[in-house]
């Protein structure tokens, strides 16, 4: 070919050099980030929510990763709670037990009410039945002291003066 002669372009090929090869299959941003949560949908919600005039490209990816991590953490703990109760299916009760028994999740979701979750079991130790001699000896051997309210352990002023 001569110098300066035009090279015919391939149909549909873009770019400076005319591109080459077949068109590649599009890859979603969720797949690129290695996430299960939808990055594109979260980005769309951020834009439609009018949280800001402009949304950076990394913001929906980061938010999707955080949401996926939190969901995985709650589901893992709820699955453990279901297994502890000898159940195969996670119900709202298991989710509540998982969240309230975890210190950090409990702090994060302190003001959240979970429908059909119930409450954490909490029985005052004074109301529990008395321990048998062998159980009390075993507990004393391990160095544990039974928890009881301060009122039950403090003496009355008359008894304190007599002693």
Curated annotation (Swiss-Prot):
A motif (SPKK motif 2) lies at residues 156-159. GO terms for molecular function: DNA binding; protein heterodimerization activity; structural constituent of chromatin. It is found in: Nucleus; Chromosome. One of its GO terms (cellular component) is nucleosome. PROSITE patterns: HISTONE_H2A. SUPFAM superfamilies: Histone-fold. Residues 1-30, 134-163 are annotated as: Disordered. It comes from the Eukaryota. Keywords: Chromosome, DNA-binding, Nucleosome core, Nucleus. It comes from Oryza sativa subsp. japonica. Core component of nucleosome. Nucleosomes wrap and compact DNA into chromatin, limiting DNA accessibility to the cellular machineries which require DNA as a template. Histones thereby play a central role in transcription regulation, DNA repair, DNA replication and chromosomal stability. DNA accessibility is regulated via a complex set of post-translational modifications of histones, also called histone code, and nucleosome remodeling. Its main location: nucleus. Contains 2 SPKK motifs which may interact with the minor groove of A/T-rich DNA sites. Phosphorylation of this motif may regulate DNA binding. This motif is reiterated in both termini of histone H1 and in the N-terminus of sea urchin histones H2B, but its presence in the C-terminus seems to be unique to plant H2A. This is Probable histone H2A.4. The nucleosome is a histone octamer containing two molecules each of H2A, H2B, H3 and H4 assembled in one H3-H4 heterotetramer and two H2A-H2B heterodimers. The octamer wraps approximately 147 bp of DNA. The keyword Magnesium does not apply. Residues 147-163 have a biased composition (Basic residues). Residues 12-21 have a biased composition (Gly residues). Gene3D superfamilies: Histone, subunit A (1.10.20.10). A motif (SPKK motif 1) lies at residues 148-151. Belongs to the histone H2A family. Transmembrane segments: none annotated. One of its GO terms (biological process) is heterochromatin formation.
């Amino acid at each position: 070919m001569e110098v300066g002669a035009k090279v015919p372009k391939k149909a549909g090929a873009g770019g400076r050099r005319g591109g080459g090869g077949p068109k590649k299959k599009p890859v979603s941003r969720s797949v690129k980030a290695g996430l299960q949560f939808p990055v594109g949908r979260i980005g769309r919600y951020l834009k439609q929510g009018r949280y800001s005039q402009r949304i950076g490209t990394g913001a929906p990816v980061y938010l999707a990763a955080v949401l996926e991590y939190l969901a995985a953490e709650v589901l893992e703990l709820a699955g453990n709670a279901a297994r502890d109760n000898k159940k195969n299916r996670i119900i709202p009760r298991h989710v509540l037990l998982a969240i309230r028994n975890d210190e950090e999740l409990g702090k994060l979701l302190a003001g959240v009410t979970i429908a059909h979750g119930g409450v954490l079991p909490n029985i005052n130790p004074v109301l529990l039945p008395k321990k048998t001699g062998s159980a009390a000896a075993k507990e004393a051997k391990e160095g544990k002291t039974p928890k009881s309210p301060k009122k039950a352990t403090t003496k009355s002023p008359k008894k304190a003066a007599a002693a």
